[in-house]
Structure formats: C-alpha cells, structure tokens
Design a protein with these regions (language model features):
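Conserved loop->alpha-helix
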Residues: 1-109
Length: 109
C-alpha cells in the first residue's frame, strides 16, 4: 500500500529484456533506503526491488504490467516518481493506493 505522495525521483539508467519482461535499472537517492524484495511505487506502479548496488536498484515489469501500464514506454534518461511502501506505524497522509494497474487511458480534454 502507498499514500500516493512522491518521496523520491529516479532516473532510468538502463533497460534490458528478459523474454517478454523489461528489467529497469533506476538511479535514485532512494536506493540507500531500499531492501531486496521490498515493494515500491514507480510512477504509481507497484514493482519489487530485486537488487540494490550503491545508488542503483533493479526492478522487473512483467508482460501484463507492461500491457496495462505506461512502463513499456519508459526509456533511459526518463525521470519517474518513487514512493516506498507505507508503514502502518507512521502518519497516513495522502490516500490508500495499491499500485495495481488495471489499464491506461488518454486524456483528450
């Protein structure tokens, strides 16, 4: 669960393909606070941290996530919004946000 309040910004440094999945290497000050297997919000999409080295961490978006979100359009150099998972013993500012994306839409007006 997330609050929807952006804590950090991250820069997509590298993208690699693994079958139908996209692996993102993201540089951010958030990396020093992350742990492997921790969920985080990446532009509102819940992705799991797979590795952390210095100020770069790795996450993978599977085919369904790429199909139902805008993660498939991310490119090296893009800046994305980051938020760590909400703590139940902290303040609950913002809103309850799960980060499970059902689809995308285009705003025409």
């Amino acid at each position: 669960m997330f609050t929807g309040i952006i804590e950090y910004l991250g820069e997509i440094k590298q993208i690699s393909l693994e079958k139908s999945n996209r692996v993102f290497y993201i540089q951010s000050d958030a990396a020093s606070h992350l742990k492997v297997d921790e969920s985080g919000s990446h532009n509102g999409i819940c992705l799991t941290v797979e590795s952390v080295k210095k100020n770069i961490f790795r996450v993978t978006a599977i085919a369904e996530t790429l199909e139902k979100s805008n993660a498939g359009s991310w490119n090296p150099g893009d800046i994305i919004n980051l938020e760590r998972a909400m703590k139940l013993n902290g303040r609950l500012d913002g809103h309850f946000v799960q980060g499970h994306v059902d689809g995308t839409a285009i705003c025409i007006n």
